[in-house]
Amino acid sequence: MNDRSAAITIGGQEFELLLTTRATKEIAARYGGLENLGEKLMQSESFEMALDEIVWLITLLANQPILIHNLRDPDKRELLTTEVVELLTSPFDLAAYKSAVMEAMSKGTKRNVESENDEKTRISGDG
C-alpha cells in the first residue's frame, strides 16, 4: 500500500482505495466535482440509490491500483465490478468502508507543501 491510499477488505481479499486523476475525472463527470460528492451521496432519492453510488465509488477507487498494476506488469489482474462488490459485501461493510474512502480521497487531494518549500530553499540557496 502506498502513502496515497487506504485499505479495505472485500470477500477476504485486501484492496487499496486510491484517488487518481482518472478517478477524479470520473467522479467529476458523475457528480460535478469532488466537492459535490458528499452532497450527492446524501441526497440520493432512495436507500438503493445510495448503496449503488457507494458501491460505484468503492469499485472505482479499488480499481485504480489494479489498473496501475496492469499498466506496468504483464501479469494482469482482474478488475472489480460493482456486481462483485455487491455480492461480497453487506450494507454494514459499506458503512465501515466510508472512513477508508474518505481517507483515500483526503490523501489523494492533499498537497505536499513541505517538498515545495524544500525545493524553493534549494533554488534560492537559503538552505
Residue ranges: model-predicted function:
Residues M1-G11, A29, E35-M49, I66-G127:
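Charged interaction scaffolds used for protein-protein
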